Amino acid sequence: LDQFSNPDNPLAHYEGTGPEIWRDTRGGITHFVSSMGTTGTIMGTSRYLKEVNPAIEIVGVTPTEGSSIPGIRRWPEEYLPGIFEASRVDHTLDVSQQDAEQTALALASREGIFCGISSGGAVAAALELSEQVDDAVIVVIICDRGDRYLSTGIFPD
């Protein structure tokens, strides 16, 4: 499968995720936020969104130095996934492991969204972005499930 180099990975998001976001926001999206693991989601969705509106800001989420957030990586230049194109990301926001875990817990307890740590990181970045911009329509991808993290202790009994 090799989702880090498989062109079908971003293609699925170019053909599916991007058009769905555009349709569901009625073209109102101003910012797209996505964690950067394989980078397939952000690559394919960015490609589609920039084709329909180049003004949409694409924001990648990376862990702060020293943080370990499953599913989100801080890629050294020499190890970037084969599908990654830097020109498709306008900028990145760093998120700490603690913020990612706390946001995942808050989403579960307050909103009933049982997501994983990488999704917590993406939502934390989107919330940070929302404090920096006015009148924005920010779309963030929740890409993992919380059941994969039950053994980590971030979700209390």
Where are these regions (language model features)?
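Short glycine/serine/threonine-rich phosphate/pyrophosphate-binding segments
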Residues: 35-45, 118-126, 149
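Glycine-rich beta-alpha junction loops
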Residues: 5-8, 37-40, 62-67, 76, ...
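Hydrophobic/aromatic beta-strand patches that form the interior of the parallel beta-sheet core
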Residues: 1, 33, 59, 91-93, ...
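Active-site/ligand-binding loops adjacent to catalytic centers
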Residues: 50-117, 132, 153-157
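Glycine-rich cofactor phosphate-binding loops and adjacent beta1-alpha1 units
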Residues: 20-61
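Phosphate-binding loop/pocket of nucleotide- and phosphate-handling active sites
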Residues: 127-157
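Alpha-helix C-terminal capping segments
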Residues: 44-52, 124-134
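Active-site/ligand-binding-proximal alpha/beta "capping" segment
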Residues: 2-36, 98-114
